[in-house]
A protein has these predicted regions:
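Glycine-rich ThDP/TPP pyrophosphate-binding loop and its adjacent helix/strand module
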Residues: 1-31
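Local beta-strand N-terminus motif with an aromatic residue
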Residues: 3-4, 70, 117
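Short beta-strand segments
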Residues: 9-10, 35-37, 121-125
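Short glycine/serine/threonine-rich phosphate/pyrophosphate-binding segments
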Residues: 10-21, 99-107, 131
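Residue-level marker for beta-strand->alpha-helix junctions and adjacent short loops that shape enzyme
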Residues: 14, 40-41, 127
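Active-site/ligand-binding loops adjacent to catalytic centers
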Residues: 25-98, 135-139
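Phosphate-binding loop/pocket of nucleotide- and phosphate-handling active sites
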Residues: 59, 105-139
Length: 139
């Protein structure tokens, strides 16, 4: 039973990340928290531009982010997010949305940075049901 080492979640308005991060840090003070954003969001210092990953990403930094204790930001391309949407559907039979695909891609990056066997948790906030007309399962 190892303690939780990392939390990885997308941020749109920031509410999900902030609420869960604070609760988990109370229980696990050494917890590393990583925000997931699509390429085109500005949290990592890049310029804002359009992206296809729905539900996460910001065009301005919300004021409460200044006081938030997080380890880093993982920027995930639309291509990687949608790759994992398709991978999860094909291999696990789950219909996740693009922000969930981005969360998985970022979680895999973070897992490589953690010690072997460390525990990590993420959030899959969306399903792909509302995006089926956008042909997200086509390669």
């Amino acid at each position: 039973n190892k303690p939780l080492a990392a939390f990885v979640a997308g941020a749109g308005s920031g509410g999900t990340f902030v609420g869960i991060q604070k609760a988990l840090q109370d229980a696990y003070p050494e917890l590393k928290g990583y925000i997931v954003e699509p390429a085109g969001s500005i949290l990592n210092g890049g310029p804002a531009h359009s992206h296809r990953t729905e539900g996460i990403g910001v065009e301005f930094i919300p004021p409460f982010f200044k006081d938030l204790d997080y380890t880093g930001v993982k920027t995930i391309s639309d291509e990687d997010a949608f790759y994992y949407v398709r991978w999860v559907a094909k291999n696990l039979g789950l219909f996740i949305g693009s922000s969930s695909g981005a969360a998985l891609a970022a979680s895999l990056e973070v897992a490589k940075e953690l010690p072997h066997g460390a525990n990590l948790v993420t959030v899959f906030p969306d399903s792909s049901e509302r995006y089926l007309s956008e042909h997200i399962y086509e390669e």
